[in-house]
Amino acid sequence: MKKNIHILLAATLLFGATSCEDFLQKDPPSSPSQSVFWQKKSDFESALAGTYSVMYSGVFSQIMPCLDGLTDNAIVQHSEGTYGWAKTIAQGDLTPNQGGFVTDIYGNCYKGIARVHILMEQLDQYTGSDISADEKKFMLAQCKALRGYFYSWLYQCYKEVPVVTQSLDLNTMNQPKATRAEVLNR
């Protein structure tokens, strides 16, 4: 009898746990999907903060302030672990095979530009009443300023880079390099 109760209880738990479809279809709260994001003003503010956060990544927060060490305004004497590639660049030892400084600027700038474009596109489509027209204009102005900031670094470091004007997908991700004038005007 006791054995039958255990089997019945196990079967009930087994079938009860697998019958709930909603149980397995939850969106993770730490990384919401596009279908549940962009529903309210705080989502747009979070996305804008995420775009600003690119400016606090290693290359922008640690290496960029040390670029005076590449001029006659300062001297770079610290190890690579302290200030990234500034000493290597100052000594003229940076090669294309080294990662870090060169690739981080490129990647982080385009990460920021991608976030800007996604935010601008979603803001353009948003019809909620919790964001006023003035707030939309202000957010768009911040997006354009951030995009200009990222392109200014790309221009300073690379001159001719792809100019991205919208979110990219698999069909549009291979963009040609733009001329220096196009990058500068962006």
Label each region the model flagged.
Residues 1, 20-22, 51, 116, ...:
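Terminal processing/anchoring signals of secreted or surface-associated proteins
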Residues 1-29:
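Bacterial Sec-dependent N-terminal signal peptides
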Residues 2, 62, 129-131:
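Short secondary-structure capping/junction motifs at helix and strand boundaries
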Residues 20-71, 174, 181:
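Membrane-proximal, proline-rich intrinsically disordered regions
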Residues 27, 155-166:
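Short, well-structured active-site flanking segments
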Residues 45, 53-58, 82-158, 172-185:
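Conserved, well-structured interaction surfaces
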Residues 62-77, 82, 154-155, 162:
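Short, solvent-exposed turn/loop segments enriched in Gly/Ser/Thr/Pro and often Arg
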Residues 168-170:
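Short, charged/polar, low-complexity loop and linker segments
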